[in-house]
Amino acid sequence: MESWLFLLGILAIAIVGKNKSLIIGVSAVMVFKLIPQTQNFLKLLQTQGINWGVTVISAAIMVPIATGEIGFKELLNVIKSPAGWIAIGCGVLVAVLSAKGVGLLAMSPEMTVALVFGTIIGVVFLKGIAAGPVIASGLTYVILTVFNLVPGH
């Protein structure tokens, strides 16, 4: 019962905040929760969902390359600018932090609750997007490492 109340609360916040992605995500989880024999699928979604999402995002990012909108000329132009190098650096940093964050979530699943709560606040009230949990977990890992507070170490 507690999980239903929690999900309904998140759904209500998502509706008030008019966040379609969160509304769809919570609604889908609630529908799967209603259907008998979906525990294994929900577990699979929990363990592989982020990877699936990253795959979809990666495919979406590749579309301009596939359609010819972005080619080597654009790549060469962007690496000639400071903004391009900053973007490359940020991409590398986020990739490394995300890898560390996924490791932290594996070591300390209870951290997920705080990250999800923070992500919901950011998504609903600050008009962010829900790509935050992996990046947030990576930042959390770095901060916890600095203060020697990483769970399990």
Swiss-Prot record:
Q: Does the keyword Transmembrane helix apply?
A: yes
Membrane topology according to the record: Multi-pass membrane protein
Q: For this UniProt entry, which segments traverse the membrane? A: 4-24, 52-72, 85-105, 115-135
- Which InterPro entries does this chain map to? UPF0756_TM
The set of disulfide-linked cysteines is: none
Sequence similarity: Belongs to the UPF0756 family.
How is this protein named in the record? UPF0756 membrane protein LCABL_15860
Tell me yes or no: is Cell membrane among this UniProt entry's keywords: yes
Q: Which GO terms describe its cellular component?
A: plasma membrane
**Cellular location of this protein?**
Cell membrane
Residues spanning the signal sequence: none
Q: Which UniProt keywords apply?
A: Cell membrane, Membrane, Transmembrane, Transmembrane helix
